[in-house]
Protein backbone atom coordinates (compact mmCIF):
# COMPACT_ATOMS: atom_id res chain seq x y z
CA UNK A 1 0.00 0.00 0.00
CA UNK A 2 2.80 2.36 0.97
CA UNK A 3 4.60 1.48 -2.29
CA UNK A 4 1.50 2.24 -4.35
CA UNK A 5 1.06 5.58 -2.55
CA UNK A 6 4.68 6.60 -3.16
CA UNK A 7 4.42 5.53 -6.81
CA UNK A 8 1.26 7.61 -7.26
CA UNK A 9 2.92 10.63 -5.61
CA UNK A 10 5.93 10.29 -7.88
CA UNK A 11 3.75 10.18 -10.99
CA UNK A 12 1.77 13.22 -9.79
CA UNK A 13 4.92 15.24 -9.15
CA UNK A 14 6.26 14.34 -12.59
CA UNK A 15 2.96 15.43 -14.17
CA UNK A 16 3.01 18.72 -12.25
CA UNK A 17 6.63 19.32 -13.31
CA UNK A 18 5.68 18.70 -16.93
CA UNK A 19 2.78 21.17 -16.70
CA UNK A 20 5.03 23.79 -15.07
CA UNK A 21 7.67 23.26 -17.76
CA UNK A 22 5.03 23.61 -20.48
CA UNK A 23 3.85 26.79 -18.79
CA UNK A 24 7.37 28.19 -18.78
CA UNK A 25 7.78 27.41 -22.50
CA UNK A 26 4.41 29.00 -23.27
CA UNK A 27 5.29 32.10 -21.25
CA UNK A 28 8.65 32.35 -23.02
CA UNK A 29 7.04 32.07 -26.47
CA UNK A 30 4.40 34.63 -25.52
CA UNK A 31 7.09 37.05 -24.33
CA UNK A 32 9.04 36.66 -27.59
CA UNK A 33 5.89 37.10 -29.66
CA UNK A 34 4.93 40.21 -27.70
CA UNK A 35 8.43 41.66 -28.15
CA UNK A 36 8.34 40.99 -31.90
CA UNK A 37 4.93 42.64 -32.19
CA UNK A 38 6.17 45.76 -30.39
CA UNK A 39 9.24 45.91 -32.63
CA UNK A 40 7.08 45.64 -35.76
CA UNK A 41 4.79 48.39 -34.48
CA UNK A 42 7.74 50.70 -33.86
CA UNK A 43 9.16 50.09 -37.35
CA UNK A 44 5.71 50.73 -38.85
CA UNK A 45 5.70 54.08 -37.03
CA UNK A 46 9.11 54.92 -38.53
CA UNK A 47 7.89 54.16 -42.06
CA UNK A 48 4.66 56.11 -41.58
CA UNK A 49 6.58 59.10 -40.18
CA UNK A 50 9.24 59.00 -42.91
CA UNK A 51 6.87 58.91 -45.90
CA UNK A 52 5.18 62.18 -46.83
CA UNK A 53 7.75 64.46 -45.20
CA UNK A 54 10.89 66.39 -46.09
CA UNK A 55 14.10 65.57 -44.19
CA UNK A 56 17.60 66.86 -43.53
CA UNK A 57 20.43 64.42 -42.78
CA UNK A 58 22.97 65.24 -40.05
CA UNK A 59 24.53 68.63 -40.85
CA UNK A 60 24.63 68.17 -44.64
CA UNK A 61 23.03 70.62 -47.04
CA UNK A 62 19.86 70.01 -49.02
CA UNK A 63 16.58 68.25 -48.31
CA UNK A 64 15.38 64.71 -48.93
CA UNK A 65 11.67 64.31 -49.70
CA UNK A 66 10.40 60.78 -49.09
CA UNK A 67 7.12 60.06 -50.89
CA UNK A 68 4.58 57.37 -50.01
CA UNK A 69 5.00 55.84 -53.47
CA UNK A 70 8.70 55.24 -52.56
CA UNK A 71 10.20 58.02 -54.66
CA UNK A 72 12.86 60.14 -52.97
CA UNK A 73 13.70 63.63 -54.24
CA UNK A 74 16.82 65.59 -53.25
CA UNK A 75 16.97 69.39 -53.68
CA UNK A 76 19.61 71.95 -52.77
CA UNK A 77 20.42 75.54 -53.71
CA UNK A 78 19.14 77.47 -56.67
CA UNK A 79 18.04 81.08 -56.96
CA UNK A 80 19.27 84.33 -58.50
CA UNK A 81 22.61 86.13 -58.29
CA UNK A 82 22.68 89.89 -57.54
CA UNK A 83 23.23 90.35 -61.27
CA UNK A 84 20.05 88.46 -62.13
CA UNK A 85 21.63 85.22 -63.30
CA UNK A 86 19.74 82.03 -62.52
CA UNK A 87 21.55 79.52 -60.31
CA UNK A 88 20.33 76.03 -61.14
CA UNK A 89 19.57 73.90 -58.07
CA UNK A 90 21.00 70.43 -57.52
CA UNK A 91 18.18 67.91 -57.97
CA UNK A 92 18.21 64.11 -57.82
CA UNK A 93 15.57 61.38 -58.15
CA UNK A 94 15.64 57.91 -56.70
CA UNK A 95 13.75 55.45 -54.50
CA UNK A 96 13.66 54.20 -50.92
CA UNK A 97 12.72 50.90 -49.22
CA UNK A 98 12.48 49.63 -45.65
CA UNK A 99 13.34 46.03 -44.78
CA UNK A 100 12.98 45.43 -41.06
CA UNK A 101 15.07 48.08 -39.30
CA UNK A 102 17.08 48.86 -42.46
CA UNK A 103 16.35 51.93 -44.61
CA UNK A 104 17.81 51.91 -48.13
CA UNK A 105 17.98 55.09 -50.22
CA UNK A 106 19.22 54.93 -53.82
CA UNK A 107 19.51 57.80 -56.31
CA UNK A 108 19.37 57.05 -60.04
CA UNK A 109 19.57 60.39 -61.86
CA UNK A 110 20.50 63.98 -61.05
CA UNK A 111 20.90 67.42 -62.56
CA UNK A 112 22.62 69.65 -63.60
CA UNK A 113 25.24 67.75 -65.56
CA UNK A 114 28.23 67.07 -63.36
CA UNK A 115 26.22 66.85 -60.12
CA UNK A 116 27.55 63.74 -58.38
CA UNK A 117 24.61 61.86 -56.86
CA UNK A 118 27.02 59.41 -55.19
CA UNK A 119 27.76 62.10 -52.60
CA UNK A 120 24.16 62.01 -51.36
CA UNK A 121 22.58 59.68 -48.82
CA UNK A 122 22.98 56.71 -51.13
CA UNK A 123 23.22 53.62 -48.94
CA UNK A 124 21.52 51.39 -46.38
CA UNK A 125 21.12 52.65 -42.82
CA UNK A 126 20.69 49.96 -40.17
CA UNK A 127 19.13 49.90 -36.68
CA UNK A 128 16.65 52.60 -37.68
CA UNK A 129 14.42 53.88 -34.86
CA UNK A 130 12.70 56.99 -33.49
CA UNK A 131 14.48 59.14 -30.93
CA UNK A 132 13.07 61.96 -28.83
CA UNK A 133 14.25 65.45 -29.68
CA UNK A 134 13.85 68.94 -28.26
CA UNK A 135 15.44 71.36 -30.71
CA UNK A 136 15.26 74.95 -29.45
CA UNK A 137 15.49 77.88 -31.84
CA UNK A 138 14.63 81.50 -31.26
CA UNK A 139 15.53 85.15 -31.00
CA UNK A 140 15.43 87.86 -28.36
CA UNK A 141 11.64 88.01 -28.49
CA UNK A 142 10.52 84.41 -29.06
CA UNK A 143 11.59 80.81 -28.58
CA UNK A 144 10.45 77.76 -30.58
CA UNK A 145 10.81 74.14 -29.47
CA UNK A 146 10.60 71.39 -32.10
CA UNK A 147 9.55 68.26 -30.23
CA UNK A 148 9.16 66.05 -33.29
CA UNK A 149 11.29 62.90 -32.96
CA UNK A 150 14.37 62.19 -35.06
CA UNK A 151 14.82 59.11 -37.20
CA UNK A 152 18.16 57.68 -36.12
CA UNK A 153 20.22 54.83 -37.56
CA UNK A 154 23.76 53.68 -38.31
CA UNK A 155 25.70 54.26 -41.55
CA UNK A 156 27.68 51.40 -43.09
CA UNK A 157 30.88 52.94 -41.65
CA UNK A 158 29.45 52.80 -38.11
CA UNK A 159 28.72 56.52 -37.76
CA UNK A 160 25.35 57.74 -36.56
CA UNK A 161 22.75 59.04 -39.02
CA UNK A 162 20.23 61.59 -37.73
CA UNK A 163 17.28 62.56 -39.91
CA UNK A 164 15.33 65.65 -38.83
CA UNK A 165 11.80 66.26 -40.10
CA UNK A 166 11.08 69.45 -42.05
CA UNK A 167 7.96 70.35 -44.03
CA UNK A 168 5.02 68.11 -44.88
CA UNK A 169 4.77 67.26 -48.58
CA UNK A 170 0.95 67.17 -48.80
CA UNK A 171 1.64 63.78 -50.37
CA UNK A 172 -1.35 61.90 -51.85
CA UNK A 173 0.69 59.17 -53.58
CA UNK A 174 0.54 55.48 -52.65
CA UNK A 175 2.39 52.17 -53.11
CA UNK A 176 -0.03 50.61 -55.61
CA UNK A 177 0.76 49.76 -59.23
CA UNK A 178 -1.71 52.47 -60.28
CA UNK A 179 -0.81 55.36 -57.98
CA UNK A 180 -3.75 57.49 -56.84
CA UNK A 181 -1.62 60.62 -57.32
CA UNK A 182 -2.04 60.19 -61.09
CA UNK A 183 -5.69 59.22 -61.26
CA UNK A 184 -8.10 61.55 -63.01
CA UNK A 185 -7.92 63.68 -66.15
CA UNK A 186 -5.02 66.03 -66.83
CA UNK A 187 -4.59 68.59 -69.63
CA UNK A 188 -1.62 70.06 -71.48
CA UNK A 189 -0.91 72.08 -74.61
CA UNK A 190 0.63 69.91 -77.34
CA UNK A 191 2.70 71.15 -80.29
CA UNK A 192 2.91 68.92 -83.37
CA UNK A 193 5.63 69.24 -86.00
CA UNK A 194 3.24 69.36 -88.97
CA UNK A 195 1.37 72.32 -87.38
CA UNK A 196 4.07 74.31 -85.55
CA UNK A 197 1.91 77.43 -85.14
CA UNK A 198 -0.96 75.63 -83.43
CA UNK A 199 -1.31 74.32 -79.90
CA UNK A 200 -3.56 71.30 -79.50
CA UNK A 201 -5.33 70.40 -76.27
CA UNK A 202 -4.11 67.05 -75.01
CA UNK A 203 -5.55 65.04 -72.14
CA UNK A 204 -4.58 61.93 -70.19
CA UNK A 205 -7.14 60.13 -68.04
CA UNK A 206 -5.57 57.64 -65.63
CA UNK A 207 -7.99 55.02 -64.26
CA UNK A 208 -7.74 52.85 -61.17
CA UNK A 209 -7.77 49.66 -63.26
CA UNK A 210 -4.48 50.56 -64.99
CA UNK A 211 -5.94 51.91 -68.23
CA UNK A 212 -5.19 55.39 -69.58
CA UNK A 213 -7.18 57.30 -72.20
CA UNK A 214 -4.99 59.57 -74.38
CA UNK A 215 -6.59 62.32 -76.46
CA UNK A 216 -5.05 65.03 -78.65
CA UNK A 217 -7.86 66.99 -80.27
CA UNK A 218 -8.31 65.96 -83.88
CA UNK A 219 -5.09 63.90 -83.86
CA UNK A 220 -5.10 61.05 -81.35
CA UNK A 221 -7.76 59.17 -79.38
CA UNK A 222 -6.86 55.79 -77.90
CA UNK A 223 -6.79 53.77 -74.69
CA UNK A 224 -3.61 52.17 -73.38
CA UNK A 225 -2.22 50.92 -70.06
CA UNK A 226 0.13 52.32 -67.43
CA UNK A 227 1.89 51.15 -64.27
CA UNK A 228 3.67 52.88 -61.39
CA UNK A 229 6.57 51.82 -59.18
CA UNK A 230 8.93 53.78 -56.90
CA UNK A 231 7.62 57.13 -58.12
CA UNK A 232 8.00 56.29 -61.82
CA UNK A 233 5.18 55.81 -64.30
CA UNK A 234 5.49 53.73 -67.46
CA UNK A 235 2.90 54.64 -70.11
CA UNK A 236 2.45 52.13 -72.92
CA UNK A 237 1.34 54.78 -75.41
CA UNK A 238 2.38 58.33 -74.56
CA UNK A 239 1.06 60.98 -77.01
CA UNK A 240 1.00 58.39 -79.81
CA UNK A 241 0.12 54.70 -79.85
CA UNK A 242 2.85 52.21 -78.96
CA UNK A 243 5.29 54.91 -77.80
CA UNK A 244 6.40 53.55 -74.42
CA UNK A 245 7.70 56.23 -72.06
CA UNK A 246 8.78 56.24 -68.40
CA UNK A 247 8.90 59.33 -66.18
CA UNK A 248 9.35 60.34 -62.58
CA UNK A 249 6.27 62.29 -61.52
CA UNK A 250 4.99 64.69 -58.88
CA UNK A 251 1.44 65.67 -57.99
CA UNK A 252 1.48 69.24 -56.69
CA UNK A 253 -1.49 70.09 -54.44
CA UNK A 254 -3.86 68.10 -56.65
CA UNK A 255 -3.84 70.84 -59.29
CA UNK A 256 -1.07 69.66 -61.62
CA UNK A 257 1.36 66.85 -62.28
CA UNK A 258 4.94 67.24 -63.48
CA UNK A 259 6.69 64.55 -65.51
CA UNK A 260 10.50 64.34 -65.31
CA UNK A 261 12.96 62.59 -67.62
CA UNK A 262 14.47 59.40 -66.19
CA UNK A 263 17.60 60.07 -68.27
CA UNK A 264 18.60 63.56 -67.07
CA UNK A 265 16.12 64.56 -64.35
CA UNK A 266 14.81 67.62 -66.20
CA UNK A 267 11.09 68.36 -66.43
CA UNK A 268 9.49 66.90 -69.55
CA UNK A 269 5.96 68.33 -69.31
CA UNK A 270 3.28 69.79 -67.04
CA UNK A 271 -0.30 68.49 -67.02
CA UNK A 272 -3.02 70.50 -65.27
CA UNK A 273 -6.31 69.57 -63.65
CA UNK A 274 -7.97 72.75 -64.95
CA UNK A 275 -8.14 72.74 -68.75
CA UNK A 276 -8.24 76.56 -68.91
CA UNK A 277 -4.87 76.87 -67.17
CA UNK A 278 -2.89 75.26 -70.00
CA UNK A 279 -2.75 78.60 -71.83
CA UNK A 280 -1.35 80.53 -68.86
Language model feature labels by segment:
Residues 27-31:
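C-terminal motif of bacterial Sec signal peptides marking the signal peptidase cleavage site
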Residues 34-93, 99, 104-223, 227-280:
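Lipid interaction determinants
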Residues 1, 32-33:
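Terminal processing/anchoring signals of secreted or surface-associated proteins
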Residues 1-10:
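N-terminal secretory signal peptides that target proteins for export/translocation
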Residues 10, 14, 18-26:
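Hydrophobic helical h-region of N-terminal Sec-dependent signal peptides
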